[in-house]
């Protein structure tokens, strides 16, 4: 009995080492998972019931991991069910890698199609809005030029009025200053020459 217990413990330790080695190799490489899983099954067939209990725990872990990966594939990848069936036959790591690569390709295609649609929809809008903007710009330029012209005309009229008023005041001051200095109204030179000529003619007679 003691020898059987020792042998069972020894075989259990060997089974645990084999399962740990298979799990470590599945994490590192994807191609050797199928062969290592067969070795685990062979060890389980030769081991005692205690080792069978340990081997039943390892498939549950692998099944749980595979189910979790299949859930993630179903939630993320909506491309085709055939990819899900093929990934269930392969190892879980390879299925996750293939599902992520498929998702990346599908997302990139959707983004490119959306960008092309947006660019094609924006081009006719800009072509339609161009004449309106040009007309608005032309109207604004015409209004600005008319406003500048009106201001120039008003300034010119004000300048002419000020110049006329200044000339009239200057003439008025000249006439008023000459009359005040002589003590009487200014007499034109033509009248003075006529009077002198008449005086000379009367004196000669």
From Swiss-Prot:
Residues 40-135 are annotated as: Disordered. The chain crosses the membrane at residues 147-167. It is found in: Host membrane. Keywords: Host membrane, Membrane, Signal, Transmembrane, Transmembrane helix. Residues 40-133 have a biased composition (Low complexity). It comes from the Viruses. GO terms for cellular component: host cell membrane; membrane. Residues 1-19 form the signal peptide. It is a single-pass membrane protein. Its main location: host cell. This is Uncharacterized gene E9 protein.
């Amino acid at each position: 009995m003691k020898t059987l217990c020792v042998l069972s413990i020894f075989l259990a330790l060997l089974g645990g080492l084999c399962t740990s080695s298979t799990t470590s190799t599945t994490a590192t490489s994807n191609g050797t998972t199928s062969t290592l899983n067969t070795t685990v099954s062979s060890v389980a067939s030769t081991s005692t019931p205690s080792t069978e209990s340990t081997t039943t725990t390892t498939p549950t872990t692998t099944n749980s991991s595979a189910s979790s990966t299949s859930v993630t594939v179903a939630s993320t990848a909506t491309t085709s069910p055939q990819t899900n069936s093929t990934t269930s036959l392969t190892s879980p790591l390879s299925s996750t890698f293939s599902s992520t690569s498929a998702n990346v390709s599908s997302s990139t295609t959707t983004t490119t199609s959306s960008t092309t649609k947006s660019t094609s929809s924006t081009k006719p809008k800009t072509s339609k809005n161009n004449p309106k903007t040009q007309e608005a710009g032309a109207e604004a330029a015409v209004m600005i030029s008319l406003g500048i012209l009106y201001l120039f005309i008003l300034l010119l009229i004000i300048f002419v009025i000020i110049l006329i008023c200044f000339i009239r005041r200057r003439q008025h001051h000249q006439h008023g200053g000459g009359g005040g200095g002589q003590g009487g109204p200014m007499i034109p030179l033509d009248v003075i020459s006529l009077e002198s000529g008449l005086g000379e003619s009367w004196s000669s007679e």
